[in-house]
């Protein structure tokens, strides 16, 4: 008789999955035993309260990146507090969603993307926990950013989207803008030459900080519009972009739920340990 049983998670590091996304996820993700917490961190307050609960029996923590009223612009998001709060609550993984703008003809509005690399083009955001400020961790961490995401976690998001038969791109490079404005035609042509496939305003430094915190991090993005790189291309309005996102947000929730269920069945002890060792092994401390 063929054994179709999935491996059971028996690892000594019980998993807990953080979810960071846009305001609409707060109303579409169903959490059992829902509890709300105001978490304090050395870096200030997170974007909003954190909602803890169970998704199919898996411990999860949900945070709205821009606030539940979507009233925090990308530059002013306290990325360090958001990630530190997830770490403080014991999250081993963070799954995130992003709205993305396409720089490629074959990546269309309504498509889903599971990026495998990033370009940080922001200029005004705190990039590290280890900045020497009062209350921050001691030392300087020179963290390698290849790969930019946890590949195993990334594959779970990709598999979940494909199992739901969603139009999904398995690899892409996302460039993060400072925002809140969109980029010019000239800027978009530069970004395309750099190898960027999509634009975000919130992926960086979130991904870097999650890695610095020793958390397994991966993203799934929804393409909401095509950016202009030719003079005759139409330009989407913010209302049109929001409309595309709202029409697909339930699909994002389904991807997350399926990925969470599959992640919870596996042993992650080695991956969790490696993520923590990576951080510890990349300090520059001359007093050792």
Curated annotation (Swiss-Prot):
Glycosyltransferase recorded as keyword: yes
Marked site (Important for substrate specificity) residue numbers: 183, 238
Annotated binding of phosphate, by residue: 65-66, 202
The protein's Enzyme Commission number: 2.4.2.1
Keywords noted in UniProt: Cytoplasm, Glycosyltransferase, Nucleus, Purine salvage, Transferase
UniProt keyword Thylakoid present: no
Compartment annotation: Cytoplasm; Nucleus
A Pfam family of this chain: PNP_UDP_1
Top-level enzyme category: transferase
Binding, substrate: 201
Highest taxon in the source lineage: Eukaryota
One BP term from GO: L-methionine salvage from methylthioadenosine
A GO term, aspect molecular function: S-methyl-5-thioadenosine phosphorylase activity
GO CC terms of this entry: cytosol; nucleus
Annotated pathway: Purine metabolism; purine nucleoside salvage
Reaction it catalyzes: a purine D-ribonucleoside + phosphate = a purine nucleobase + alpha-D-ribose 1-phosphate
Main location: cytoplasm
Family: Belongs to the PNP/MTAP phosphorylase family. MTAP subfamily.
Biological function: Purine nucleoside phosphorylase involved in purine salvage.
HAMAP family on file: MTAP
Misc: Although this enzyme belongs to the family of MTA phosphorylases based on sequence homology, it lacks several conserved amino acids in the substrate binding pocket that confer specificity towards MTA.
Assembly description: Homotrimer.
Protein name (record): Purine nucleoside phosphorylase
Top-level taxonomy: Eukaryota, Metazoa, Ecdysozoa, Arthropoda, Hexapoda
